[in-house]
Amino acid sequence: MKQRLIEAQHITEDILNAPKFYFNELKPSMLLDKLAAVYAITDSTTGEVLYVGRTKNIRQRLYNNHLMGPKTNARLKKYLVEDPNQPLITDMLAAKEYLKANCYAQYIPENDMVKRGQLEGLLSYMLNVRYIHEEH
């Protein structure tokens, strides 16, 4: 058990020390295609982690979905629009502009699907993420 706690701390440090990809500079070519990973999106003005997710393709998820995608593919933008604490973010375009003006993403590669799910939950807790997927 103690070893798992140490590993959890190292994983948290790994994502916090990973390269930052600022949404205002993000281009698809900056991200590896078809790389499975767990990622965190952070508000650079406050340091608050807004969202933690997992994906089979980091390029598609961050660029095509979170930045450019519609409400159905971009959960974080949906959460921002629906957040009563974000009264200036009234639509998906405003949410996109907020991401570009304020946010960056960091990720750690992970090929194993089960471990990605575990890491998503772990990092959501360890980083005290603001937005969590609704339960079904």
List the model feature ranges, each with a label.
Residues 16-17, 34, 74, 93, ...:
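Alpha-helical structural elements
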Residues 20, 37, 49, 77, ...:
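Intrinsically disordered, low-complexity segments enriched in small/polar residues
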Residues 95, 102-133:
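Non-catalytic interaction/Regulatory regions outside core domains
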Residues 29, 58-111:
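Conserved short loop/helix modules at catalytic or binding sites
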Residues 1-67, 110, 114, 118, ...:
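GIY-YIG nuclease catalytic motif and its immediate N-terminal context
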